[in-house]
Amino acid sequence: TFSVEASTMGLGNLIGPVNVSYYDEETLPYVLNRVLYQYGYTYHYSGSMDSGFYLKSIDRAGITDGYHVPDAIVSHLEDVNDIPDPDTCSADWLGEGTLTGGSGWMYSVNGTYMSSGMNTYFPADGDVIRVRFTLYYGADIGEAMQGRETWGDW
């Protein structure tokens, strides 16, 4: 299954989980491209689909409408002095730099966050792929990146 999630923003799942077909020799950016466009989203990235792919933002008019960062996450962000700045939140895209300096998109496969770029992963039948928005380097989605603690899994 495949999902795109923004629960750290109080927005729940933007997509899915949905069943997705995976094709031989197709890397994850191509799957992401198909799913996002199918559900009416566009996106920005750096690198290329085949090398150094980094998902910078997912875009659609009103994507952040009604967002509300859970109070527990705000408290943790205040503790690390990365206070959410509403001026950095666009109504039309969600990505790196939204609200905090540590925000961006991460992905996990079968419950494990991947340390390599999406372009290096070839999805297989049965995979559970989650593309998730984090406000602080993954700490709010259950990933202790760069030696940081994890705050829970929103």
Across the structure, where does each feature detected by a protein language model lie?
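Ubiquitin-like/PB1-type beta-grasp interaction modules and other compact soluble beta-rich domains
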Residues: 1-154
